[in-house]
A protein has these predicted regions:
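C-terminal partner/receptor-binding element of secreted or periplasmic proteins
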Residues: 95-125
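Short, non-transmembrane alpha-helical segments in secretory-pathway proteins
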Residues: 28-52
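Bacterial signal peptide processing site
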Residues: 21-23
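A short, polar/charged loop-to-alpha-helix boundary motif
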Residues: 79-83, 101-103
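Exposed beta-strand-loop-beta-strand "reactive/processing" segments of non-cytosolic proteins
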Residues: 56-75, 80-81
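Sec-dependent signal peptide recognition
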Residues: 2-10
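C-terminal motif of bacterial Sec signal peptides marking the signal peptidase cleavage site
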Residues: 16-19
Length: 125
């Protein structure tokens, strides 16, 4: 009986430790399969860094007839980034030294539609 209880406790501890620290990157009900792998890789990159201020987020929008992924600027002089589904950089809509991004898509904030927050870094800074 004692051996059975010990085995049960060890099994429970094993399962718990295997799940500890794992995070479902996507906070949306659609799941991870709705986020392109290259965007998932960018999220993984961000998670390896210090917590941003403000915390990092990834949004999905429709812009100029395509699905795009927006990572807002992390602070002051850092530009935001707007990517295609293949992680090709479209532009930096804002941020950077001028605060205006790279001026390659000045219409982004006025014409984007279908905003969906896909991920937000919930780590404590």
């Amino acid at each position: 009986m004692n051996a059975s209880i010990n085995a049960l406790i060890l099994s429970a501890l094993f399962v718990f430790t295997q799940q500890c620290g794992k995070e479902n990157i996507s906070k949306n009900p659609e799941g991870l399969d709705q986020i392109p792998e290259c965007i998932q890789a960018k999220i993984a990159e961000i998670r390896q860094q210090e917590v941003w201020n403000p915390p990092a987020k990834v949004y999905r929008y429709q812009f100029r007839g395509q699905t795009v992924y927006f990572i807002p600027q992390r602070c002051c002089d850092f530009p935001s980034q707007l990517f295609t589904e293949n992680c090709e950089l479209i532009c930096a809509p804002d941020g950077g030294f001028s605060g205006s991004g790279d001026n390659a898509c000045p219409d982004f904030f006025n014409t984007r539609t279908d905003e969906k927050l896909l991920w937000e870094d919930k780590r404590e800074g």
